[in-house]
Amino acid sequence: MHAPPLRTLRHLATALLATLLIGAVAAQNVVEISVAHTMTGGAHRDAFDRIIEAFHEAHPTIRIRQIPQDMEIYQDTGLIAMLQSNDPPDIWFQWGGDLVRRDAELGFALDLTDYLAQDGWGDSFLDASWSEGTGTMVGDRIFMMPYAFDVTTVLWYNTDIFAEHGLSEPETWDEFLDIVRTLRAAGVTPIILGNQQFWPLGNWAGHITARVVGMDLFDKALSLEVPFNQPAFEEAFQRFAELAEAQAFNRDLAGLGASESMAAFFQGAGAMHPIGSWLISNAFSSAPDGFSYDAFNTPVIAGGAGDPQSIIGLATGFEVSSRSAHVDEAITFLRFFTSFDHQVAWAEAGRFSPIEGAMAAAEIDVHNKALAELFLDANELVPPPDTGYPVEIADIFYQGAALVAGGLRSPAAALAWIDEQLALVR
């Protein structure tokens, strides 16, 4: 065998070097955008992954790096630790309301108002996206781009269990209590719920309380303008005492996690499960074949000062870091994500898209359609206490409600305890 001519070797080396240089330059030109969120599974995570894959094909010089965290870790310590670090994510998931206000006031979140005003991008969203109740704005400035509307508590129920015991959806609180008693007498756990982190029961407790005392008093108490220990709130907390007396909950209510209780509901461990609209996307991937379920809003509470047909909910969405070195690329991704076709796919994965017309165009689950109609038709939107108000205030309210629902304290004693604890944070 003859050795190749020296000239040929030089040509090969030159070509190889050129290829390496082109690859290095191309790699240097690729921008990475980090996105922190709580989508650890479910149909909506699959849809999000597919949207990112399509984005990479359309924008080969921008790569999306996902930072998923369990929701409870993310909400408690995960997100704030990232935001306070020297390398915060470029984009992160947030709940609308007080947390958006916090992120804006502390300088974490970028003002998105002018970006959304470009090329009619903001006009592609439903009007509810920019209403006070959804929590996307601080004053007249937009700091969170909504990616879904969430009804944060309805009563999901196992339709087979209801049918077996001859039960139908209740219209009033008294009818609801009758259902609870019937199920308990039959040896069925009426309500399966994991309240280890307090918010699952706490959100529902917030809705019940707002229904009884009215939004004005509800807002004043959670804003620390008036005490909780007064007759109107005692009347509201009496509803939790009624649930405790009827043995409505699973015995491990205080120790069970939110995810575990949802999984238990899918397996038939309880007849009802009070939680939000995200159950739908989880049911797509986690509920067994043949699992049949439906939902009803918190029943009408007689004599309540609040709107008897109110819902509890908010917008969730993405914020952009004010410290991001790649704001334009982050906005490019968000515009791609909220484009009509991708939002139709998002809706079909079980999320309530905020984009005009996406829900109507999507082939969506009947449950998702029903909750979308419930959200848009509601005259009053009650903010979840842990997003509409400072978390430290909401947590104390949640713990007080849990004391009553667990049969550990009377309504009056729990309300006195709430005021004592709040005195330390005023």
Predicted regions and their residues:
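Extracytoplasmic "Venus flytrap"/periplasmic binding protein-like
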Residues: 50, 54-129, 160, 164-171, ...
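Extracytoplasmic/periplasmic substrate-recognition and gating elements
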Residues: 53, 57-58, 85, 165, ...
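A structural signal for short loop-to-beta-strand junctions that line the ligand-binding cleft
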Residues: 89-90, 121-159, 189-192, 305-310, ...
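Hinge/lid segment of periplasmic solute-binding proteins
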Residues: 98-153, 177, 204, 232, ...
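Short, solvent-exposed loop/beta-turn-alpha elements that line the ligand-binding surface or hinge
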Residues: 113-129, 212-235, 285-288, 300-309, ...
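Long, aromatic- and glycine/proline-rich binding clefts that accommodate carbohydrate-like moieties
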Residues: 126-130, 296-300, 347-396, 403
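Extracytoplasmic/periplasmic solute-binding protein
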Residues: 137-147, 153, 177-225, 270
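Glycine-centered hinge/linker elements that transmit conformational signals in sensory
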Residues: 180-183, 222-253
